[in-house]
A protein has these predicted regions:
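Bacterial N-terminal signal peptides
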Residues: 1-9
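Alpha/beta-hydrolase fold nucleophile elbow
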Residues: 162-173
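Glycine-rich nucleophile elbow surrounding the catalytic serine of serine-hydrolase chemistry
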Residues: 171-181
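Short beta-strand/loop motif that positions the catalytic acidic residue
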Residues: 379-381
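A catalytic-pocket lid/entrance helix-loop region that shapes and gates access to the active site
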Residues: 181-183, 188-288, 421, 437-453
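Cap/lid segment of the alpha/beta-hydrolase catalytic domain
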Residues: 84, 93-161, 207-208, 215-216, ...
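Catalytic-loop region of hydrolases
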Residues: 13-86, 102, 243-248, 257-338, ...
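Conserved alpha/beta-hydrolase "acid-adjacent" motif
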Residues: 387-391
Length: 509
């Protein structure tokens, strides 16, 4: 009888504690609802896996730090007996604009109190939300993430009657940019951060998107040519690591020149015209400022040109064009008639640096305060990423080391920053390689969930136990689900995997 009373009383107390959060006083914010949920099921949707979130208190909050701000977020709180004592916040993607609760399933089921924000607006796939709303640019750039962090921890303390022992942030793409922004602007918000494929040089990246679109308008590259380009780049560079597996292990060592498949006569899908050779070379090299000659952003890497989530989607499928054009037409020029066909790349870059870089760019190398806080930062980037070219992330880590050295800090960043480059992976996940290592919102069933195979678990172990990850094991699930999965070693940059071990890399350019 006593046991039965306990079983009845515990859910009732949890529901009462959850509903009580509606009365918590929050600066310039309010709890819209706080409801005890027995669980939430997410069906398969596109390439999204089906998932089930366990019981939790779902708290919806709206914050108005300025009169122009309308920041929404949702916080999921596991039952007190299931809480691991920690807080994990997820980042957004693209232009944000949605409280994407699917991202909360895995951290909740692992015992985290977890939250995600809409970045302060409702999305329509463009930057139109910024027109006439300068504060919403700041909300999107950095403020919504910080507000969500501060308010969530206030609610966590009220619900559990104790503060979270650790706080983590995990994001990829724009979420990766948000992750670096937190380390740079709000170094005490999080004890550990995972930044995947960070769109850190936002103003430069958007300018590069427009430059690439202009390049392809003037010198088109048919998608039917991508298979020949990839076949040739793999023939040139796949075996440089000693293994022919359809993956370029380190594209920086690749010397592929598309002129190798220039048409000798006529034109067909197995070769490139002279103009197409020049176009592909320019895409690999990255766009330059036509006035100064300075490179605007690193270019694309060889080896995944024909992958559905790489060049086929981002370069020829219009994704770069869509993001870049809206960035300038709506955010930078505020709907004042920017003409994509007659745009001046030099002028556009200068305008972007003036009007959006102060709020969106996140490549400040000064991480002294984050290091002093005891923060740990793990970065990852796919070598086949055609959305955010990967060399920019390597350059950022190098810039941090150089900055620290110039300011009397240890140049060796191993104590708080580590980067993992992922061969055969596109943007954030996916591609022909082994690309599952805790980076997806919901991991596939074949993924071993421990700190050797999961980057978020590796971060937690580093923060709580002081054991930094030297390597990760990435998995490529195969069907049927009970078949053996393919794995690949991911090494701490600048090391590379050779014969099942991480070894020092050579000297790529």
């Amino acid at each position: 009888m006593l046991a039965l009373l306990v079983l009845i009383t515990l859910p009732a107390k949890a529901d009462e504690a959850c509903r009580a959060l509606a009365g918590v006083a929050l600066a310039h914010a309010r709890v819209e609802s706080a409801i005890e949920q027995p669980g939430v099921d997410f069906p398969v949707k596109g390439d999204r896996l089906a998932a089930h979130a366990g019981a939790h208190c779902a708290v919806r909050v709206v914050s108005h730090p300025t009169t122009d701000s309308d920041i929404h977020f949702e916080l999921w709180l596991p039952p007190a007996g299931a809480w691991n004592g920690k807080y994990l916040q997820k980042g957004s993607g693209g232009w944000g604009g949605e409280v994407y609760t699917y991202a909360l399933v895995t951290p909740l089921n692992r015992g985290y109190a977890t939250a995600v924000t809409d970045d302060g607006h409702v999305a329509d796939g463009t930057a139109r939300f910024t027109v006439g709303h300068p504060q919403k640019i700041r909300d999107f750039g950095y403020r919504a993430i910080h507000e969500t962090s501060v308010l969530s921890r206030r609610l966590i303390a009220a619900y559990y009657q104790r503060a979270a022992s650790q706080a983590y942030f995990v994001g990829c793409s724009d979420g990766g940019r948000e992750a670096l922004m937190q380390a740079q602007r709000f170094p005490a918000d999080f004890d550990g951060i995972v930044a995947g494929a960070p769109a850190a040089r936002w103003s430069h990246l958007m300018t590069a998107f427009v430059a690439n679109a202009r390049l392809l308008d003037n010198a088109p590259l048919p998608s039917s040519k991508l298979a020949a380009i990839q076949k040739a780049s793999l023939a040139s560079c796949d075996a440089l690591d000693g293994v022919r597996d359809g993956i370029v292990d380190d594209p920086r060592r690749c010397r592929f020149d598309p002129a190798a498949i220039q048409c000798k006569a006529g034109d067909n899908d197995d070769c490139l015209t002279a103009q197409q050779v020049a176009t592909v070379r320019a895409l690999y090299a990255g766009p330059v400022d036509p006035v100064t000659g300075a490179r605007i952003h690193p270019g694309l890497e060889p080896g995944m040109e024909d992958d559905g989530g790489s060049w086929r989607l981002w370069i020829l499928g219009g994704e770069q064009r869509k993001f870049g054009f809206s960035n300038f037409a709506d955010l930078v020029y505020q709907g004042q008639g920017w003409d994509s066909t007659g745009s001046d790349i030099h002028r556009d870059l200068a305008a972007a640096q003036e009007r959006e870089a102060p709020y969106l760019d996140a490549f400040n190398p000064d991480l002294r305060a984050f290091r002093a806080h005891g923060g740990k930062l793990l970065l990852f980037h796919g070598w086949g990423d055609a959305a955010v070219p990967p060399r920019g992330t390597i350059e950022y880590v190098q810039d941090v080391g150089n900055f620290m050295s110039r300011h009397g800090e240890p140049a060796n960043l191993d104590g708080f920053v580590r980067l993992f480059m992922v061969p055969g992976m596109g943007h954030c996940w996916g591609g022909p390689g082994a690309t599952s290592f805790g980076n997806e919102e919901v991991p596939p069933a074949a993924l071993t969930q421990d700190a050797d195979h999961d980057i978020v678990m590796a971060l937690d172990r580093w923060v709580t136990q002081g054991k930094a990850p030297e390597q990760l094991i990435a998995t490529r699930p195969v069907e049927p689900a009970n078949s053996s999965a393919r794995t690949r070693l991911l090494c701490k940059y600048p090391q590379v995997a050779r014969n099942g071990r991480c070894v020092a890399a050579g000297n790529p350019p």
